[in-house]
């Protein structure tokens, strides 16, 4: 009888822990505007957002990077991120005096920089 009660209590605690852990924050989908915004925020990169009145159209600009437009969205935070962000380069935290391929939207290079 004692083993049965102990097993029931263990199962109850385990089930409760699973339910509580599943009820946390909603996962942000990679490739979304919100994912890119969170990634840059987590790396201490400050940006400015231009947002339409309905909140769907968004433009993310990083003033410290010559006002570079990093990404845009036509469907708010959950919408697709139309820019390209070089996650690996930003994660490494390296800065070059010549060229920093951090990404962005609508950038086109014709020759070497520097």
Regions found by a protein language model. Give the residues of each.
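Residues embedded in well-ordered secondary-structure elements
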Residues: 11-13, 39
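Bacterial N-terminal signal peptides that target proteins for export
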Residues: 2-11
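Surface-exposed acidic/polar loop and edge beta-strand patches at domain peripheries
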Residues: 23-114
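Hydrophobic h-region of N-terminal signal peptides that target proteins for export
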Residues: 15-23
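Enrichment for repetitive, rod-forming helical segments
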Residues: 13-15, 114
């Amino acid at each position: 009888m004692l083993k049965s009660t102990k097993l029931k209590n263990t199962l109850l605690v385990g089930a409760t822990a699973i339910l509580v852990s599943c009820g946390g924050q909603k996962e942000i989908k990679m490739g979304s505007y919100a994912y890119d915004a969170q990634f840059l925020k987590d790396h201490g990169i400050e940006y400015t957002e231009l947002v339409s009145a309905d909140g769907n159209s968004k433009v993310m600009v990083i003033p410290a990077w010559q006002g570079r437009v990093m990404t845009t969205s036509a469907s708010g935070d959950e919408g697709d991120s139309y820019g390209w962000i070089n996650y690996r380069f930003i994660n490494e935290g390296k800065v070059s005096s010549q060229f920093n391929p951090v990404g962005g939207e609508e950038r086109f290079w014709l020759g070497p920089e520097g």
